[in-house]
From Swiss-Prot:
The keyword DNA damage does not apply. Its main location: cytoplasm. Residues 1-10, 35-57 have a biased composition (Polar residues). The modification Phosphoserine is found at residue 557. The gene is BUL2. A motif (PY-motif) lies at residues 129-133. This is Ubiquitin ligase-binding protein BUL2. It comes from Saccharomyces cerevisiae (strain ATCC 204508 / S288c) (Baker's yeast). It is found in: Cytoplasm.
Length: 920
């Protein structure tokens, strides 16, 4: 919906929302009033006042009465219009909570001001008014390069009279600026004298180009913000999250600490910055960001890996030279004092006055997807928003290490606003995915002129994203193996190239580009062709990553067999071979005694005859998903009724994007059994099922380097294959170390051979990265250091005998009468009379769970087993949605165990399932 904002009245600082239907009614009433007024004027023109007679005077009285009636009608219509306008105003006020001015921020402004830390060599006062045409022309002529396009000829001149001006600081090229020195020369010269600038000073300042926030080579990028040292200062920052957008001079309602956000939700709040000292404090920059990162800790290596996959900057909340209107559309007047006596906004002077509080409002909208550059391997599933997972116990000197899960509540926190929420999500202490609202003040040390963090504050958020396509149980093992095979082929190709040049080294022969890459993109076989080795290797990696972009289409449409060209369902299969002696008396279980049939007795031909066959079990991977499960306190706080209007509309919009089949939660699995009896076996009834049990398997994998391939449950749960994979890449890792050492020892000789036949070409350096790039090295280290943790949970689902549906006795009797007569029916009747409860349970178990064997054709039977998946309401664990990121992943499986009578064995199958947040 597109909202049209009126530029007229702005009550409480919010623009009114225009309602089309109500406005049309008002215009219609106004049109009717104008028509009546025009008709009244026409009537008056037909009764002129000149030449009135007594009869005319009577008509005049009638006209007066008519006019008064018209006035009353007009007043009545005005009341109706006013009432409609008031209704329109009330409807506008009711929709203010949903109002959002969704405007794309200026990339130039972000690139110039927030992408790096400004160094302040521009006087902020000069940004208040635009320069004159003469100043712009003078500045342009100064900045423009000369005819030879040399930037070095544009020089900086120190401002006369500056105490900090150095003799050798009067000539610096624009490309070699030192912003810290330049800014002091400029700002100090304009303020040290304590007087207004002369005309000569104006001329000198106008010649200084505005390199602040523009010259990327001289500024400190925001990525280095996290490596700056922290300084202890008397500055305090407090972050508050509110339920709705804050309105100046009104106290907002704060959000609950247990609040969970999802994709598309809006996060409102404000920051309080207070200088508690008696002296003013200068700062360089103030940032308010929404950030998310993954933390992986390797205790053996003593290594902590952080991958920041999300950083959103609120331009209106962070410091800037001007006041940016917030996206909420609220009219905020900088410099005013709010209800808590805090000054709204920060001054251009970048100074915090003593014992003064400042306030900055912020608003963030959670994205539905990350940027493509988030994953270098271009895995689409890695570019989806992952859920909050564990907590970072090692952050801020182990500030959150003391958080424990309350056994009653099922979660734990510090008890203060902004604390992370710890649940039993089965994430170890060395792995976490965190979302925070961060506020940082960057300052500068007066003695060393180096930047530092004067104060920082964070507010932890709990995010459970909406389930978009990408992470699904439908992705099969073929995709994983294909990507793994392509990666291994590339690594083997690089090793072969290294072996070639080492052989050339032994033979003292010249090294060509064909030896390095075994290819020539120029289309010729000239070994002296000047090729960029890094470019060739980059293209090979790009080609490898292009295949990663192609996700499995199994979740969208059935896969096809390349030979038969027929659709093949995404199935999980297993089989069991059985063999047992045929006896007159069968040692069956209690249920089989209850439900034995006449075929069992008739098939017993002799005590020494063996019955054998094969049972095949197949389950189709379900498209439905299990619901995200959290502690009851979190579920109660985040129920649909407790959400804001914007969050309700956002959730309904997201749910409307999903197909109907995905919206339905997974409540059962249809297991198909096929019994194929041996030809040399006597005819017999297939083995009966004695029990059906379920388990919930949790698979968590992590690595301290970016994972290059897409994982699947089949690979991660196969211990033998996983160990072979790790062993192979550990061997690759060892080879890389040996090759690197040998290359460095013979670096000079290798470069001599590489440039031997390059007489007419510029000499080039041969590097080890031309063979094994940093990306390939990362891929090897990632799979070599892969760690997988598998947890079996036995109490997630209810037992099958506790999932029976209640049926009427008539229905049960009809179903029971439809069964073929049994030779042991008298025994069953006796048992039913004796153990009525057991008979009822056995009947329901057969009718609702295991059903009966059906003969399809000679020596072949089929059976459908319904495995109910009803969650236990007393689950202590938290089942977070499936996730797959560059450093970690979480998958789930439902393990179904079917046990047969007479100790014939059991069948076990692991069905991959998804856990998604589809219900509130």
């Amino acid at each position: 919906m597109t909202f049209t904002f009126s530029t007229s009245s702005r009550k409480n600082g919010r623009p009114p929302l225009k309602s089309v239907s109500t406005e049309d009614n008002i215009h219609l009433l106004r049109k009717r009033r104008q028509q009546q007024l025009s008709s009244n004027s026409t009537d008056n023109s037909l009764h002129p006042n000149s030449g009135q007679t007594p009869r005319a005077s009577d008509s005049q009285d009638d006209d007066i009465r008519s006019a008064s009636t018209t006035n009353l009608d007009r007043l009545r219509q005005e009341r109706e219009e006013n009432s409609l306008e008031m209704d329109c105003t009330q409807s506008r006020l009711s929709h203010r909570a949903n109002m959002l001015v969704d405007v794309l921020p200026s990339f130039e402004m972000y690139n110039a001001l927030h992408r790096h830390i400004p160094q302040g060599n521009v006087d902020p006062d000069r940004h208040d008014f635009p320069p004159s045409y003469q100043e712009v022309r003078t500045q342009r002529m100064t900045i423009l390069p000369s005819n030879d396009n040399s930037v070095e000829r544009s020089q900086l001149t120190a401002v006369p009279g500056s105490e900090n001006a150095c003799n050798n600081a009067t000539a610096h090229s624009l490309t070699n600026l030192h912003p810290l020195q330049t800014q002091h020369l400029t700002i100090n010269s304009t303020r040290s004298g304590g007087q207004s600038l002369h005309s000569s000073s104006d001329t000198n300042i106008s010649q200084i180009p505005f390199e602040d926030d523009l010259n990327d080579s001289d500024n400190i990028f925001i990525d280095k913000l996290y490596t700056l040292p922290k300084l202890s200062t008397p500055i305090e920052i407090d972050i508050r999250i509110t339920k709705t957008a804050s309105i100046p001079h009104e106290r907002p309602e704060e959000q609950s600490i247990l609040k969970e956000y999802t994709s598309g939700d809006i996060i409102h709040g404000y920051c309080l910055i207070e200088n508690r000292s008696s002296q003013p404090l200068k700062f360089e920059m103030f940032y308010v960001t929404l950030e998310a990162y993954i933390s992986v800790i390797d205790r053996q290596k003593g290594k902590r890996t952080l991958k920041r996959f999300l950083r959103m900057v609120d331009l209106s909340a962070s410091w800037s030279y001007t006041n940016i209107t917030p996206s909420t559309g609220i009219n905020i007047v900088p410099g005013e004092r709010d209800f808590d006596d805090a000054i709204i906004g920060l001054s251009n002077s970048r100074e915090l006055k003593p014992n003064t509080k400042y306030k900055k409002f912020f608003m963030f909208k959670l994205p539905t997807q990350l940027l493509d550059v988030t994953c270098k391997q271009e895995q689409f599933s890695h570019c989806l928003l992952p859920p909050s997972f564990g907590i970072d116990k090692y952050k801020n000197n182990c500030k959150y290490s003391g958080i424990k899960v309350n056994s009653v509540l099922g979660c734990g926190h510090l008890g203060t606003k902004g604390s992370p929420i710890l649940t039993l999500d089965m994430a170890d202490d060395n792995l976490s995915i965190n979302y925070t609202i961060d506020a940082k003040i960057v300052g500068k040390d007066k003695r060393t002129s180096k930047l530092n963090i004067m104060k920082e504050k964070e507010y932890n958020l709990r995010v459970m994203p909406f389930p978009f396509a990408g992470v699904t149980n439908q992705q099969n093992e073929k995709t994983c193996l294909r990507q793994l095979k392509n990666l291994e082929s590339l690594i083997e190709d690089r090793f072969e190239a290294l072996n070639k040049i080492f052989k050339k080294l032994e033979l003292n022969e010249a090294i060509s580009n064909v030896d390095i890459h075994d290819t020539d993109i120029s289309g010729t076989l000239d070994g002296n062709e000047d090729l960029d080795s890094d470019e060739i290797l980059r293209r090979k990696l790009d080609q490898l990553h292009i295949n990663n972009r192609i996700d499995d289409t199994a979740s969208q449409s059935p896969s096809y067999d390349s030979k038969n060209m027929a659709p093949k369902e995404n199935l999980v299969e297993t089989e069991l071979r059985y063999k047992f002696k045929n006896k007159n008396k069968s040692n069956s279980s209690l249920f089989s005694h209850f439900l034995s049939s006449s075929e069992t007795g008739s098939s017993s031909t002799g005590p020494h005859v063996y019955n054998s066959g094969l049972i095949v079990l197949s389950v189709k991977k379900p498209q439905s998903t299990l619901p995200y499960w959290s502690p009851s306190l979190l579920r109660k706080t985040n129920k649909f009724e407790a959400k804001s209007e914007q969050e309700k509309e956002n959730w309904q919009r997201l749910m409307g994007m999903l197909p109907e089949g995905v919206k339905t939660p997974l409540t059962k699995l249809d297991v198909h059994l096929t019994c194929i009896q041996s030809n040399n076996s006597a005819g017999h009834k297939p083995p009966e099922i004695s029990s059906v049990t379920t388990e919930f398997v949790v698979i968590t994998a992590k690595s301290d380097n970016s994972i290059p391939i897409k994982f699947c449950t089949e690979l991660l749960m196969n211990e033998n294959r996983l160990n072979k994979l790790k062993t192979k890449f550990l061997t690759y890792q060892k080879k890389v170390h040996e090759y690197r050492k040998k290359f460095e020892e013979n670096h000079a000789k290798l470069n001599e051979l590489y440039n031997r036949n390059r007489d007419h070409f510029t000499p080039k350096e041969l590097l080890f990265t031309n063979f094994i790039s940093d990306q390939i090295n990362n891929d090897i280290d990632s799979l070599a250091g892969l760690k997988v943790n598998i947890i079996d949970l036995h109490d997630i689902f209810k037992k099958q005998i506790h999932t029976f549906e209640e049926e009427n006795e008539d229905i049960i009797s009809k179903k029971g009468s439809s069964n073929p007569p049994s030779a042991s029916s008298s025994n069953n009747n006796f048992l039913q009379a004796t153990f009525s409860n057991g008979a009822s349970t056995a009947t329901k178990f057969t009718q609702q769970i295991v059903h009966e064997w059906e003969k399809v054709k000679p020596l072949q039977y089929k059976r459908d087993v319904t495995v109910n998946l009803k969650l236990n309401p007393n689950i202590k664990e938290t089942l977070v949605p499936n996730l797959e990121t560059c450093l970690c992943c979480r998958f789930y499986c439902v393990r179904v165990n079917i046990k047969f009578d007479n100790h014939l064995g059991s069948m076990k199958v692991d069905i991959p399932v998804d856990v998604k947040k589809l219900q509130i």
